Regions:
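Glycine-rich phosphate/nucleotide-binding loop
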Residues: 23-131
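Active-site rim beta-loop-alpha module in soluble metabolic enzymes
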Residues: 1-27
Length: 131
């Protein structure tokens, strides 16, 4: 959600109910129409969403903005989590940490994050069978 506690039933803002929930419903409908089997829930309070995802409820979380996602991702699995940018004409994945320019040329960087980002990009790019 956008507002604290996803709006707390309107007490802390109506955006989650009036703007975000209808968008999630449209996305859910489009996925079903495309034959994609996915659990699409929300809006969910950010502090709960990531705890539930790490616990296995979902395979991923779509966050409202960058820092809302990167902070819990780094706490849960720094180094091997992958950031995916949606809404672009290309598949874009990136490591969950910064550029690490201070490590350039020193052979001290761990490539696991880059490998995870490349693997996910390959998976997202793969053709999917249509129903």
């Amino acid at each position: 959600g956008l507002n604290p506690h996803a709006g707390e039933g309107g007490l802390l803002g109506r955006d989650d109910a009036t703007r975000i929930a209808p968008g999630i419903a449209r996305a859910r409908g489009r996925l079903r129409a495309a034959g994609v089997a996915a659990t699409v829930d929300g809006p969910v309070p950010a502090e709960s969403a990531f705890r539930l995802a790490v616990g296995g409820r979902w395979d991923g979380v779509v966050a409202m903005y960058h820092d809302q996602a990167t902070i819990p991702m780094k706490v849960a699995s720094f180094g091997d989590a992958v950031n995916v940018s949606l809404g672009l004409p290309i598949v874009r994945t990136s490591v969950d940490h910064g550029t690490a320019y201070d490590r350039a040329g020193r052979w001290t960087a761990d490539e696991a994050g880059m490998r995870a980002a490349l693997s996910l990009a390959r998976l997202l790019r793969a053709p999917r069978p249509r129903p």
